[in-house]
Amino acid sequence: MQISSRFCPILANILAHRREPDLIKYAHPNFSPFLHRTGIHSIQGVDDSLQLPFCRYFLFRVVTLMPSAQLEVAIQACRKAGNFINRESLDLSAIEAREKAPFDFVSRVDTGAQEHITSIIRQYFPKDSIVAEESGTIVNPGADGVWYVDPLDGTTNFLHGFPHYAVSIAYALKGRVMAAAVYDPVKDELFSAERSRGAFLNNARIRVSGRTDMSKALIGTGFPFRRNDNYETFLPKLERVARSCAGLRRAGSAALDLCYVACGRLDGYWEANLKSWDLAAGSLIVLEAGGLVTDLSAGEDYLATGGICVGTPKIFAPLLMKVTDANTGK
């Protein structure tokens, strides 16, 4: 539980000892212009049981910050798909995979997980569109809401028993990602975020690292793997970054790499030739954790271009300079 109050420490202390798991309580001013400087943040629902005399005396009221329906659905779908993936992982030898494109694999686990996800989304938001990796786009004309679904980001890792893969779901309204959830079923780690409400790992607030020196930064990336990918443009960027940072990691799941930047395990990350479902959830989680996000040309069209660069406020700029499409020198 968190209490936001600079003016009433007694109230904050009393309320902090009320055990309310999975809810975040805020005390915020109800009237006074002076107290209003503490700010009010997209708060819904008043908990009358916490209307203490202290609150009324100091012109405070206590409210509950509840997740949106979209985030609740994304989390529910992530967990259901993750449980399915965990069951299937008990016998990898029984899973057959096919190439949907050269070196790009899909299995019945991908399609099964996606069916779990889309059925939940359809149950609660039947009028929204869905952009999913294994089924393309399900379009509802006139729909403002769009769901980006990657049922198993890191399929190759999964098929080899390499424990680094995730379920990724994002909700966008009129082209702007508003809610996101990424679930690692191996570690039981749920990353989530809503726009202007912060980023969380298993209900605990997360922030990007405080790293400021590129020479001490740990950077993530993804190597080209498709037959027609251009190694000639990638390798100079890889060399520039490798020569300037403490270490490089290529773990094989863009969604988790982005979340690792958000929680401080990585200090930066870049990759090209991704799809919108790879990036939508993780990019919002990074932003809400205090990171910076652009495409590889320093623009904001990463969902469309498929290229992305993210990092801490101090690491982002030097990383982008080394991987930007405009930089062809060393």
Where are these regions (language model features)?
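Residue-level signal for inorganic ion chemistry
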Residues: I85, D110, I121, T155, ...
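An extended, acidic
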Residues: R207-K330
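N-terminal subdomain of lithium-sensitive/metallo-dependent phosphomonoesterases centered on the IMPase/IPPase/PAP
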Residues: F60-L152, K314, M321, T328-K330
